[in-house]
Amino acid sequence: MLKAVFFDIDDTLYDTSGFAKLARKAALNVMIDAGLPLTQEEAYKLLREIISEKGSNYDRHFNVLTKTVFGEEKPLLIALGMITYHNVKFALLRPFPNTTSTLIDLKSKGYRLGVISNGITIKQWEKLIRLGIHHFFDEVVTSDEVGFEKPNIRIFEEALRRMGCKPERSVMVGNKFNEDILGATNAGMSAILVNSELTEAERDHVEKNGLDVTVIDDISQLKEIL
């Protein structure tokens, strides 16, 4: 019988990608109005390239953007971009429609809930607090804190250790096959893929290796299967 349910945060509990895209475009519009000599399409393409190269947790994307365009950093444009990005993102931030009710349901059934996330500890806690769901989780384990990123099994093993739970009595819920699903199953856990679909190659891997993987369209389906 399952005892613990672990969740990824981004694009699992809330629409990270959608909110970030809106916030980035709003920030670029403000920077363009203040003198960035690019169209929004050009600026967004460049920003996406920078994010792809540096990673989403890098905190100087706008610094790199202005240095690329001007040959030097432009503090005013950087500050305008950062302020707008954070203001818009936090104004929009909310869980997926069925996230909170699902967490309530799982807690009422006696499950212990945890988070396993690649990211900076304070930033991940800030997301959970702003989403209004931090109090549901018994443990929040981040790559920043433990020194290993998903899919490395050591971050899953550390989460299980803190929760005091065996892998066969735990399940990981996430939207990324390589990070969440493979990482969890390699650690001996079952896994549930949400807000995504298995590719043919991923499905073949699951079947060939006899992995305990379930695919759902919406987080609310956890109420039925757990």
UniProtKB/Swiss-Prot annotation:
Domain of life according to the entry: Archaea
KW Magnesium (keyword) present: yes
One Gene Ontology term from the biological process aspect of the record: small molecule biosynthetic process
Xref: SUPFAM superfamilies: HAD-like
Documented EC number(s): 3.1.3.-
Keyword Transport (UniProt): no
Pfam hit, one: HAD_2
Cofactor(s) needed for function: Mg(2+)
Entry keywords, A to Z: Hydrolase, Magnesium, Metal-binding
GO molecular function: metal ion binding; phosphatase activity
Family (UniProt): Belongs to the HAD-like hydrolase superfamily.
Biological role stated in the UniProt entry: Catalyzes the dephosphorylation of D,L-glyceraldehyde 3-phosphate in vitro.
Name assigned to this protein: Glyceraldehyde 3-phosphate phosphatase
Organism: Methanothermobacter thermautotrophicus (strain ATCC 29096 / DSM 1053 / JCM 10044 / NBRC 100330 / Delta H)
